[in-house]
């Protein structure tokens, strides 16, 4: 049985990872999270009292606290998800992204390296540092049907993706220079329960239920590949336990959809699942409002997942249709939680 330190474990993807490990394995989890606006411990209520779960409210930029957590809990692996992740916020406030995503990752790498140096030899060799990143580091696939592979060159477009690209490079450098056994994964857009409502899918669901406009950037034809968060959590655990040191694995759902198609699909699901609409709303689709496009908006992201499917045998269990239906139903069934999401 392993003990895994999960940074950002109160966030959307991190909490799915924590829930997956506690519910489906015998491993223990130390959840390290600063609890920013997007962190939500309610997403972990069901497992919070499990004896294999512990929580530490710590900022990854605080090196002294990181050293304390490593010394106290003595993890066998790190799954690093703590990050500022919203592109729009990065455009207006890039400094927070530089600090958390780059400086914070540096601090965590150094704390992990110092900790590993004093581990017993058998645990020293088995230790893993799994860095969870994004397909946005690869840039844009406009005008092509190609997919990003793990060897695609980096071409980040936003302060967010540039900060994640920087952290990816740090992680690989700590393997090359110091021998820290690192693995990197790059994922496509995630969706599912407990998502903070600044992101596209939860924002559309919650705005529609409140009778508010559904803002769609530009013409809505930007294409994203969508991955159900629980499928991603399974993949991440499989990578940290079975992945090869020094390798990168792309994780995606192979569900390429234009943003406007996603919004219209949500509207259609709500017509079926929530037919009693807010006052003054005849059809949910009538709420769609096209707004000025985001600066530097990438036209298309999509990743090739052949490597993780071939090498680790992972594949998603949810289609976009089944996953989106589960997501919409969750928000309908969890009114109080969705208000606090």
Curated annotation (Swiss-Prot):
<feature type="active site" description="Proton acceptor">
    <location>
        <position position="160"/>
    </location>
</feature>
<dbReference type="GO" id="GO:0019305">
    <property type="term" value="P:dTDP-rhamnose biosynthetic process"/>
</dbReference>
<dbReference type="GO" id="GO:0008460">
    <property type="term" value="F:dTDP-glucose 4,6-dehydratase activity"/>
</dbReference>
<dbReference type="Pfam" id="PF16363">
    <property type="entry name" value="GDP_Man_Dehyd"/>
</dbReference>
<protein>
    <recommendedName>
        <fullName>dTDP-glucose 4,6-dehydratase</fullName>
        <ecNumber>4.2.1.46</ecNumber>
    </recommendedName>
</protein>
<dbReference type="GO" id="GO:0009103">
    <property type="term" value="P:lipopolysaccharide biosynthetic process"/>
</dbReference>
<feature type="binding site">
    <location>
        <position position="190"/>
    </location>
    <ligand>
        <name>NAD(+)</name>
    </ligand>
</feature>
<comment type="subunit">
    <text>Homodimer.</text>
</comment>
<comment type="similarity">
    <text>Belongs to the NAD(P)-dependent epimerase/dehydratase family. dTDP-glucose dehydratase subfamily.</text>
</comment>
<feature type="binding site">
    <location>
        <position position="259"/>
    </location>
    <ligand>
        <name>substrate</name>
    </ligand>
</feature>
<comment type="pathway">
    <text>Carbohydrate biosynthesis; dTDP-L-rhamnose biosynthesis.</text>
</comment>
<dbReference type="InterPro" id="IPR016040">
    <property type="entry name" value="NAD(P)-bd_dom"/>
</dbReference>
<dbReference type="InterPro" id="IPR036291">
    <property type="entry name" value="NAD(P)-bd_dom_sf"/>
</dbReference>
<feature type="binding site">
    <location>
        <position position="100"/>
    </location>
    <ligand>
        <name>NAD(+)</name>
    </ligand>
</feature>
<dbReference type="GO" id="GO:0000271">
    <property type="term" value="P:polysaccharide biosynthetic process"/>
</dbReference>
<feature type="binding site">
    <location>
        <position position="85"/>
    </location>
    <ligand>
        <name>substrate</name>
    </ligand>
</feature>
<comment type="pathway">
    <text>Bacterial outer membrane biogenesis; LPS O-antigen biosynthesis.</text>
</comment>
<feature type="binding site">
    <location>
        <begin position="293"/>
        <end position="297"/>
    </location>
    <ligand>
        <name>substrate</name>
    </ligand>
</feature>
<feature type="binding site">
    <location>
        <begin position="59"/>
        <end position="60"/>
    </location>
    <ligand>
        <name>NAD(+)</name>
    </ligand>
</feature>
<keyword id="KW-0456">Lyase</keyword>
<comment type="function">
    <text>Catalyzes the dehydration of dTDP-D-glucose to form dTDP-6-deoxy-D-xylo-4-hexulose via a three-step process involving oxidation, dehydration and reduction.</text>
</comment>
<feature type="binding site">
    <location>
        <position position="189"/>
    </location>
    <ligand>
        <name>substrate</name>
    </ligand>
</feature>
<dbReference type="InterPro" id="IPR005888">
    <property type="entry name" value="dTDP_Gluc_deHydtase"/>
</dbReference>
<feature type="binding site">
    <location>
        <begin position="33"/>
        <end position="36"/>
    </location>
    <ligand>
        <name>NAD(+)</name>
    </ligand>
</feature>
<feature type="binding site">
    <location>
        <position position="134"/>
    </location>
    <ligand>
        <name>substrate</name>
    </ligand>
</feature>
<keyword id="KW-0448">Lipopolysaccharide biosynthesis</keyword>
<feature type="binding site">
    <location>
        <begin position="215"/>
        <end position="217"/>
    </location>
    <ligand>
        <name>substrate</name>
    </ligand>
</feature>
<feature type="binding site">
    <location>
        <begin position="199"/>
        <end position="200"/>
    </location>
    <ligand>
        <name>substrate</name>
    </ligand>
</feature>
<feature type="binding site">
    <location>
        <begin position="12"/>
        <end position="13"/>
    </location>
    <ligand>
        <name>NAD(+)</name>
    </ligand>
</feature>
<feature type="active site" description="Proton donor">
    <location>
        <position position="135"/>
    </location>
</feature>
<keyword id="KW-0520">NAD</keyword>
<feature type="binding site">
    <location>
        <begin position="160"/>
        <end position="164"/>
    </location>
    <ligand>
        <name>NAD(+)</name>
    </ligand>
</feature>
<dbReference type="GO" id="GO:0009243">
    <property type="term" value="P:O antigen biosynthetic process"/>
</dbReference>
<feature type="active site" description="Proton acceptor">
    <location>
        <position position="136"/>
    </location>
</feature>
<feature type="binding site">
    <location>
        <position position="224"/>
    </location>
    <ligand>
        <name>substrate</name>
    </ligand>
</feature>
<feature type="binding site">
    <location>
        <begin position="81"/>
        <end position="85"/>
    </location>
    <ligand>
        <name>NAD(+)</name>
    </ligand>
</feature>
């Amino acid at each position: 049985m392993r003990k895994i330190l999960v940074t950002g474990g109160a966030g959307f993807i991190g909490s799915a990872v924590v829930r997956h490990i506690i519910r489906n394995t015998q491993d223990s989890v130390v959840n390290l999270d600063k609890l920013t606006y997007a962190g939500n411990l309610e997403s972990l209520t069901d497992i919070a009292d499990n004896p294999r779960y512990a929580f530490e409210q710590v900022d990854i930029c605080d090196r002294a606290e990181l050293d304390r957590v490593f010394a106290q809990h003595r993890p066998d692996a790190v799954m690093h998800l703590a990050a500022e992740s919203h592109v729009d916020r990065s455009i207006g406030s890039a400094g927070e992204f530089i600090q958390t995503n780059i400086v914070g990752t540096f601090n965590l790498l150094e704390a992990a390296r110092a900790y590993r140096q004093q581990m017993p030899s058998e645990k020293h060799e088995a230790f893993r540092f799994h860095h969870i990143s994004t397909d946005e580091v690869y840039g844009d696939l406009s005008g092509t049907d190609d997919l990003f592979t793990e060897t695609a060159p980096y071409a980040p477009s936003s302060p967010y993706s540039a900060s994640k690209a920087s952290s990816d490079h740090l992680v690989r450098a700590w393997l090359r220079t110091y021998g820290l056994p690192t693995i990197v994964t790059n994922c496509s857009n995630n969706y599912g329960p407990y998502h903070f409502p600044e992101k596209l899918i939860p924002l559309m669901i919650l705005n529609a239920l409140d009778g508010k406009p559904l803002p769609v950037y530009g013409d809505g034809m930007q294409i994203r590949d969508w991955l159900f968060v629980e499928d991603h959590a399974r993949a991440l655990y499989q990578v940290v336990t079975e992945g090869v040191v020094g390798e990168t694995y792309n994780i995606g759902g192979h569900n390429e959809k234009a943003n406007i198609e996603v919004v219209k699909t949500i509207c259609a699901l709500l017509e079926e699942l929530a037919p009693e609409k807010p006052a003054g709303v005849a059809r949910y689709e009538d709420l769609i409002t096209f707004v000025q496009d985001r600066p530097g908006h990438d036209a298309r992201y999509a990743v090739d997942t052949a490597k993780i499917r071939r090498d680790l045998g992972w594949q998603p269990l949810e289609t976009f249709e089944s996953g989106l239906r589960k997501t919409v139903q969750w928000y309908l069934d969890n009114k109080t939680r969705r208000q606090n999401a």
